[in-house]
Amino acid sequence: MKRSRLLLIIINYIYHDNIYLMSPIVDWNLLDVLNKNIRNNYKKIRPILLKWQENGYIKLIEDNEIAFSFILEKLPSKEKLIEESLNFK
């Protein structure tokens, strides 16, 4: 599965009904529910997640249970996050 498609799945989840306000934690089980290909292709999206972390949007945890958590105060608009993510080289 393409990196851009995987990222859009995650971004759409983040901003769906402001779900990030209910729980800023994204665990591996949730990623599996969103799309089974995310965990298998995690290496494809990890560089962008590292960029998100560098920008202060998320904190990568990457333990056995939790993939990452959002930093709500720093999270940009959905449109900005999509633009930054899809333009990442």
What kind of region is each of these model predictions?
Residues 1-22:
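Short alpha-helical segments that sit at the start of domains
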